[in-house]
Amino acid sequence: LNQDLTEKIAKYHAEFLDKIGSLYYSKENYDDFYFGKGSTYPDVNGSIGILFEQASSRGHIQQSQNGVLTFPFTIKNQLTTTLSTLKAASLLRKELLTYMNDFYFNNFNLNNKSKFNGIRFGNEHDKTSSYQLAKILKTHKIDVFETKGKKFKYYVPLKQKKSRLIKAIFDTNTKFEDSLFY
């Protein structure tokens, strides 16, 4: 469903960019499955992450393979996609809200099927790194608890609102449906 909503939103971007004569790339491939990319952060938080990559004018003006690219034109593209995002969000409001609601509701079902209750981490030889990781997790509203263990200092329960983000952070997935990406 995330990919379907991404495609629907992309149609608004295409419509708006067509009106100003901008070249763009949409849907040829979405590599929206690897959580190491910043554009997937909204995806693991119940939203729709869309990556916009604007060619740089390298200052005020640059010759490109598609002609002259100016700084004002790059700004115009960014503003245009901002406006198309607002229109898409407004017109797809109910679908987006339903998606977000279902995303968090389904977290409970996913958590009940998990083989693990939580994740323990820590390094007795590098307590600072463990502390900093716990601090970062907390900034993302992830529950982290200190433990009395000798090897592991922290515990992150999976049964919480941000369980998909937790799994994205700690999982070491190396198998993908499509292995052709960057």
Task: Tell me what each language-model feature is.
Residues 2-24, 28-30, 34, 40-182:
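Intrinsic-disorder/low-complexity accessory segments
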